[in-house]
């Protein structure tokens, strides 16, 4: 698949719920569970949802990677990156970051 086509269709799968060709945007916050702690892959949108899964698959496809990662907020992404750092590592950023990001860095 060429890059221009991949940017539109990369990582897409037919939505199993209703066989839609384009990924729907799931705006629900919670998902029904079969029993406590037993779900069909999703329980709460902030941690994981079908829309984010589709976005992560698209990112992975564009980068020819096995996995892609998306976060529910910019601060969550910054926190994940900071947790990968080791003592002595340096961070290069702009001085125009969200206030709490500056405190954490």
Task: Give residue spans per PLM region.
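Conserved small/polar residues in nucleotide/adenosyl-binding loops
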Residues: 103-105
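N-terminal "arm"/small-domain region of PLP-dependent enzymes with the aminotransferase-like
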Residues: 1-49, 55-57
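Conserved PLP-anchoring active-site segment centered on the Schiff-base-forming lysine
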Residues: 84-101
